[in-house]
Every structure is written in C-alpha cells, then in structure tokens.
Amino acid sequence: LWNIANTLRGKMNADEFRDYILGFIFYKYLSEKMNRYADEILVPDGIKYVEVDEHTESGQEYLEAIRDEALEKLGYFLKPTELFSQMAKRGNGDTEGADNFILEDLKRILTNIEQSTMGTASEDDFDNLFEDMDLTSTKLGRTESAKNELIVKVLVYLDKIDFHLEDTELDVLGDAYEYLIGQFASG
C-alpha cells in the first residue's frame, strides 16, 4: 500500500493523495464484493460474472436479474466491465482489442456506482462518495496521457492486493485503512 502512496508523493500533499488511495481501495472493495455476489448467483448457470457478455440479449437478461438482486442485497451495482480488476487489466494493456486509456471510463464508472443507488435505501450512503477523487486534476499529470499512466499504476498496484473478502473474520480493508491513516499521520 505504501508503494501506491509513494507513486503519488511529490505530485500532491498527503491529504490529497490519501483521498485518491482510499477512494480506489473502496472502489476495489465494492467491485470484489459485487463480483463475488454475482458469481454466487451465476453458479447454477455455470458461468462467472466477468464472462457475461453485456452486448448480447442473454447477457442483458443476466445483468438485469443480477442488478435487481445486487441493489436489494448490496445497495449498488457494477457491470462486469466496470469491475476494478477489469479496469486495471484494460489500463495495463492486458485486454485484447481495448484502448488502455481509461480515465473517462473510470470517471463514468465512479458516477455509475453512485447513480445505481438512486431510489434505494443506500442512496444517502453513496451520495458524493467519490467526489474527492478529481481525475481531471493537473496534480495527477500535465497531460491526459500522464494522468492515465499514473492512475493505471495505482490501479495495478492495488489489483495485486487480496482483501480476503471471503474471510469474514479478517477486516483487511479496515486494516489497510488504519495502516494508511497511521502512515499519513506519521509523516
């Protein structure tokens, strides 16, 4: 985690890069939770959530059913292509036929997470959740390409961290948060 902070160090002050890191950690957490939940729903169909083709009629039917259940159970929804791991792969150039420029899509996804909660019990919890993550800030880089490169580095670093969501005894996300807060406080 501290490597991620070091990637942003010197570009902005600690309070600012803390907002980006914690925002991306939360996006990763929401994505992993969504992916695990959708995978459980799809077990009887023998497919994984990331395998659902969003461009087919059957894929749309899956997404609609999963969306309804996810909003009820989790309070938010992400499409397979909006998952953190998929964006990290795409940004890193690991997705065949896809452009590795992800900034615009990432902004849209973070907005979509918040908007997916409209009219649900979780709406207030998600309102302006990612507002402190200004992906257009020149502090991330002078050019769009430089901003994209920096954000991709952060996503790729974070993608390698396993939050152990399957282990309800561990609070890895909470531990990561406390670790970062301690590091920011100490200097």
Model-assigned labels for residue ranges:
Residues L1-G187:
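Non-catalytic, mostly N-terminal accessory regions of nucleic-acid modification and defense proteins
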